[in-house]
């Protein structure tokens, strides 16, 4: 994706063009050679690499080129080692630190770790053990996760609906709720 020119760069360019047009309008006869040199000065490569002095027509092109200076050049021996390291990837396993189960990809291990995290939820001691922890997400039949909160209800009404079910939800007089 190309970066847009800033308003400042655009205004400087417009000022240069306006000055050029004023100079051209004031002269009665412009030599073709002078005009060619003048137009060439605007189209020349104006962004120069400080490392190798190569010039580029856009700042983006210069940025891409400068990145090539940061990459180390591979020798023939290093290319062979890199090729061998690609073979190693197929045999590498990701191991769960909790149950020692192995997985072929880190993404699979991450999904597996979610199972351990959900079983490790610890409730603070000041919360009554009678009130179950309320899951925010539930799985529906197609294994999609859905939000189990009714956004039309207050948080208290949502909690009561979860505890007592939809069949018996006590009516709350909001005058008495702080």
From Swiss-Prot:
Gene Ontology BP terms: cellular response to nickel ion; regulation of DNA-templated transcription; regulation of root development
Gene3D superfamilies, per database record: Classic Zinc Finger (3.30.160.60)
GO MF: DNA-binding transcription factor activity; transcription cis-regulatory region binding; zinc ion binding
Presence of the UniProt keyword Phosphoprotein in the record: no
Domain of life: Eukaryota
Any one cellular-component term (Gene Ontology): nucleus
Tissue specificity of this protein: Expressed in leaves.
ZnF (C2H2-type) intervals: 47-69, 94-116
InterPro entries, alphabetized: Znf_C2H2_sf, Znf_C2H2_type
Annotated compartments: Nucleus
Pfam families on file: zf-C2H2_6 (PF13912)
Assigned keywords, A-Z: Metal-binding, Nucleus, Repeat, Transcription, Transcription regulation, Zinc, Zinc-finger
Cited function: Probable transcription factor that may be involved in stress responses.
Name this protein carries in UniProt: Zinc finger protein ZAT11
Species this protein is from: Arabidopsis thaliana (Mouse-ear cress)
């Amino acid at each position: 994706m190309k970066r847009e020119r800033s308003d400042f760069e655009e205004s400087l360019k417009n000022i240069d063009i306006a000055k050029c047009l004023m100079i051209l309008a004031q002269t009665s006869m412009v030599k073709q050679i002078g005009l060619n040199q003048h137009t060439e000065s605007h189209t020349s490569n104006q962004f120069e690499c400080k490392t190798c002095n190569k010039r580029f027509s856009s700042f983006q092109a210069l940025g891409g080129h400068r990145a090539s200076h940061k990459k180390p050049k591979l020798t023939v021996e290093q290319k062979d080692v890199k090729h061998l390291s690609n073979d190693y990837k197929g045999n590498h396993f990701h191991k769960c630190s909790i149950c020692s189960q192995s997985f072929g990809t880190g993404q699979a291990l991450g999904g597996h770790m979610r199972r351990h995290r959900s079983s490790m939820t610890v409730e603070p001691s000041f919360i009554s053990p009678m009130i179950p922890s309320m899951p925010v997400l539930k799985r529906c039949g197609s294994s999609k996760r859905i939000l189990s909160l009714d956004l039309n209800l207050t948080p208290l009404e949502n909690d009561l609906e979860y505890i007592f079910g939809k069949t018996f939800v006590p009516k709350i007089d909001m005058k008495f709720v702080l």
